[in-house]
Every structure is written in C-alpha cells, then in structure tokens.
Amino acid sequence: MNKTAIALLALLASSVSLAATPWQKITQPVPGSAQSIGSFSNGCIVGADTLPIQSEHYQVMRTDQRRYFGHPDLVMFIQRLSSQVSNLGMGTVLIGDMGMPAGGRFNGGHASHQTGLDVDIFLQLPKTRWTSAQLLRPQALDLVSRDGKHVVSTLWKPEIFSLIKLAAQDKDVTRIFVNPAIKQQLCLDAGTDRDWLRKVRPWFQHRAHMHVRLRCPADSLECEDQPLPPPGDGCGAELQSWFEPPKPGTTKPEKKTPPPLPPSCQALLDEHVI
C-alpha cells in the first residue's frame, strides 16, 4: 500500500474517532473473564483490568481522563517493561492512554485503543519522578526535526532506542508505531541484531511517543488480529517512501460513518448504557 493510500485511511480513521460515542458512559470494567472483542479500531473488552496508578517503575499521565484500563495481558506487559527499564537504570516509564473501562470508540484522539490491547508510552525516561501537576498536563518531547526528515540529535538518547527495542522484543507485542524519522534512526542504530525492527512500523505523527499493540490473547476467541508485518526489518524502500512528497491531487476524504459494532460489543452497550 502506498503512502497516499495510507494517508487517506488515516484521515478516515480520524474522522470516525471524532464521532460521538456512548462508551464513555461506562465508568467501570464490565464483569467477566477477560475477553478482547473485535478489532483494534472497532471493538470492546469485557473484564478489563485497571493499571495500578502507583508504581515505583512507571507513572501514569492524565489520570483525570480515566484511560488506564486494558486486558490483563496489557497491564502485565506495562509492568514487565517498566521493571526491565528500571532494573537497567534507564529511568521512569511514562504511560499515556490505554483504553476506557469497556474499551470502545473514543470521542477523539484515537481510532484504535478499543480492545484493551494498545498503550501509548512517552519516548522520554525521566530520572526524577514527575510531579502530579506534570502528570496531569504532560509536556511531550518532540524528537523529530521540523521538516520530518530525521530525529533531533540533541534529543535522541540511547535509552530511547533501548526502550523501543525492549518493547519490540516482548513476546506479546505485535506492532509498535513510531514516526518514520524515529524508525529511520532505529534502523541506523540497530547494528546486526535487527529481527525486532520488523515490529516497529512507521506511522503519522507519533513524534514523542510510541504506540504499542499486543497480539490477541489466545483465549479471546472474538478478537481480530492484524496480519503480521511484512518480512524483513522494514528499513528499505517502504520506509523511504514515507519521506517522499505527497502525490498531486490528494484530497481529504469525506467523513466516514462508523462501521457496525461486533454483535457482542453491541449487546454490551445495550446492557450497560441506558
């Protein structure tokens, strides 16, 4: 798929995410065994876990938004990754949006994050823990140059490379989305150990955070996984295509009506939203 087509799909997804959503009315996880249902951009979750807000290894940002819910696998991944980072003396992991208590569509900001298997993680690792005020109104660190062609050398740190690599090497991770310039820098820094780069995918924005996505849990029978990323490290022509100018005639698509929910998600809404 060429970059222009991908751009159109991203714009369509964004317009869907801005539609009104009833999912915010569900304020607590739906009881039951953990089940991720549907796809990452059209789904929900039963039996979500709450990420503990207090941890010595990570801090949760924007807790007032209450987007710190996810499948138990996601909670365990965050705890596992942040513990590794802490043990290596790299700093504190900053956790952004996961999902809402029952997953589902946001009213803006995300087209995915619907099945409890996605998390945004800042690409900075402070040595000093942030204050409550900093966590509520976090200042993102833009690692990408103004022209989007490369990372800012004074901001790019070996610890950030290691953070992304550790996440990509996790057994449950299927994709990590970062800005193309960040992917390019990872390709330059990786050396001969490159298998993990396959999971790191270039995507629009993502200049200050990585978006980590887990594979569908084996016992979530209604969860829809994406196809695996293409073979190889993704550092060749596909990556370079992201730096080409947009083709003439590219226009913004009309807003798209959200697709029907999976039946189990619709039934969940019908039961829990008045």
Swiss-Prot record:
Family matches, as SUPFAM superfamilies: Hedgehog/DD-peptidase
Reported cofactor(s): Zn(2+)
One BP term from GO: peptidoglycan metabolic process
Residues that coordinate or bind Zn(2+) 2: D147, H150
Subcellular location: Periplasm
Keywords linked to the UniProt accession: Disulfide bond, Hydrolase, Metal-binding, Metalloprotease, Periplasm, Protease, Signal, Zinc
InterPro entries the UniProt entry points to: Hedgehog_sig/DD-Pept_Zn-bd_sf (IPR009045), Peptidase_M74 (IPR005073)
Main location: periplasm
Region Disordered, annotated ranges: 227-274
UniProt keyword Secreted present: no
GO cellular component, as recorded: outer membrane-bounded periplasmic space
Subunit structure: Dimer.
Name the record gives this protein: Penicillin-insensitive murein endopeptidase
Taxonomic placement: Bacteria, Pseudomonadati, Pseudomonadota, Gammaproteobacteria, Enterobacterales
